[in-house]
């Protein structure tokens, strides 16, 4: 029997596990439905055409090649799964939030809820930046090495894998302020700690950018590093604001006690 109608904060341990199981099942169902809807949208909205557009100027006849008759289908399937994850993400986040919210303080909820909305904006901002700026520059750089002695044979599978990886990578790393904001609201990190670890953060950002971006294009790595460093500094500012409010609230609660 589902435990969704009960308050997780008042449940025994086994009921917590039951609640978690149902939340996970609803999330999985949302992803499956999202993938089905994504398959329809990818086909009708010509999502593949949109992703191919940045490389069209470099293609003979404006078309990509494929090596197997099944390649177009599997590429469409992968795009549908990615679209399904994106479409289902609000429901998945809601399920996670519904499970964790009863254990949070009202002051923490007031910070985390707006942070989740900000996360959507930042994710879309990262994807748009990648598609409009980073991807075209990457293609111009890599295709600039083509000579008369080389014949291009750009295959749809590897190209789509590179594009989706780049778009998702920028979308995900742009969530850094949201993560730090939530951790600050929970009291797990402080602005003093973040500022003292700035050098370590830059080193970590460098490694992360190198892992997430195409390894043979150093320009793309640098283009991911620059906004990430700025986002880290912005996160420190957000952490100061949230931590100051949290400390004031804790002091007021202590005075009343």
Annotated model-derived regions:
Residues 1-257:
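Membrane topogenic/interface segments and analogous intrinsically disordered interaction regions
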């Amino acid at each position: 029997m589902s435990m969704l109608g009960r308050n997780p904060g008042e449940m025994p341990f086994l009921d917590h596990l039951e609640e978690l199981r149902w939340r996970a099942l609803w999330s999985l169902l949302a992803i499956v439905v999202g993938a089905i809807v994504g398959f329809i949208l990818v086909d009708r909205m010509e999502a593949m055409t949109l992703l191919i557009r940045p490389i069209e100027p470099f293609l003979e006849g404006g078309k990509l090649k494929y090596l197997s008759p099944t390649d177009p289908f599997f590429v469409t399937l992968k795009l549908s799964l990615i679209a399904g994850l994106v479409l289902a993400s609000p429901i998945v986040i809601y399920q996670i939030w519904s499970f964790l919210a009863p254990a949070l303080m009202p002051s923490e909820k007031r910070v985390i809820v707006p942070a989740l909305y900000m996360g959507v904006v930042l994710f879309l901002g990262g994807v748009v930046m990648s598609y409009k700026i980073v991807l075209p520059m990457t293609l111009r750089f890599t295709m600039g090495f083509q000579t008369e002695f080389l014949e291009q044979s750009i295959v749809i599978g590897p190209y789509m894998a590179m594009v989706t990886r780049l778009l998702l990578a920028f979308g995900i790393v742009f969530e850094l302020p949201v993560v730090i904001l939530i951790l600050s609201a929970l009291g797990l990190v402080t602005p003093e700690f973040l500022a003292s670890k700035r050098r370590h953060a830059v080193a970590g950002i460098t490694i992360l950018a190198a892992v997430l971006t195409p390894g043979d294009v150093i320009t793309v790595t640098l283009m991911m590093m620059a906004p990430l460093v700025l986002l880290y500094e912005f996160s420190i500012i957000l952490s100061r604001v949230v931590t100051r409010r949290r400390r004031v609230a804790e002091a007021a609660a202590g005075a009343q006690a």
